[in-house]
Amino acid sequence: MWEVSKKENLDRKLIEVCRHFRIPGEYQFCEEIKVGNVNKTYKVTFEGEDPKNPGNMRLKSYIVQSVNTFAFKNPVQVMDNIDKVTEYIHAKDPGRCALHYHHTADRKTYIFDKSGFWRLFNFIPSVTYSATENLQVIRNAGLAFGNFQMLLSDFDASQLHETIPDFHNTIKRYEQMEEQIAIDPVDRVKEVRAEIDWLESVKEQACKLTQLQLDGVLPLRVTHNDTKINNVLFDKDTDEALVVIDLDTVMPGLVGHDFGDAVRFAANFVEEDSLETEKAGVNMEIFRAFAEGFLSKTAKSLTQPELDTLALSCLALTCELATRFLADYIAGDVYFKTNYDEHNLVRARCQIALAKDMLKKMPQMESVIQDCVKKL
């Protein structure tokens, strides 16, 4: 009985949210989409008249999300960034499949009430991949993120809010780790001396991207900042990339942040928390496939310093995440969700192993990028 009541309350709330966004027709049903662990996501379906066939009825679906305001402290700024970026992309390429966030009567892309922070956008029939070794899918993912970057290459990134300050400021991430080392709140530093020493030994290389940005060598651009392959929707029949999703972290950043984090996630031989750290490393076939797709769309709009530091960006983003995992382990596991006592340490060691392999393969990675650019 309680479950029925809970379902009825959810249905009522979703109908209320949809009416705020002026969704026509009669509510039919909803289903929770349990992908991602930050926001609550629902697919809602309405029945209404088909505008292309007057007199005929059709079912149309939408995505409704309840945004996690603990994770996103300034959700209004998040939505302002998303609205600006999605409208700009649509204006530049109106015929392309795109995310469209619906507006309320007072032109807001959200409603904020006692039940939470809600938004609604179009449902796009598609498939996603959490991980794959299919090189065409990887290439298409690179193309999708590259196209996202290309369409926004002339957008003034200063118009966007920095919703997560210093998110990819590797210098600050190192400082945060070093602060935890100095405090050593739960007496774990002695366990991780080897990891600390190695990360400190590559600090200058890892922080070079951030330093070049501070020196004015690398320009700030609109960046996605969560370029995992599962943030691309693919055509279920052809594996063509349709659109980049999950724009909550869109803000000013470096193009290398998006490229490097995508490679870090997709091209590792193992999962980022694998216990088999000896198997961690860069799959060069996947690296090449992603680079081919990404650069086919971006090479002509990137500066030479940006192109020259793309391979380095992979090392920078990997070391950055390693410092975050290690800092959290030293702090007593207060930030990242863990499944067992040494989970953050395992994560840090896996990223360090990946970074070590990146250092060995840096000449190969740089050569691949140069080859991709030459072929255009």
Model-based region annotation:
Residues 252, 256-300, 316-335:
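Active-site activation/catalytic loop segments of kinase-like enzymes and analogous catalytic loops
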Residues 19-27, 91-97, 300-301:
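Short secondary-structure junctions
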Residues 1-31:
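Juxta-kinase regulatory segment immediately upstream of eukaryotic protein kinase catalytic domains
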Residues 37-46, 51-52, 56-59, 63-64, ...:
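Active-site acidic catalytic loop and adjacent metal/ATP-binding pocket
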Residues 49-53, 57-159, 182:
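ATP-binding pocket architecture of kinase catalytic cores
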Residues 122, 293-314:
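Hydrophobic alpha-helical bundle architecture
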Residues 358-362:
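Long, compositionally biased intrinsically disordered regions
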Residues 24, 31-35, 73-76, 127-139, ...:
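ATP-dependent phospho-/nucleotidyl transfer catalytic cores
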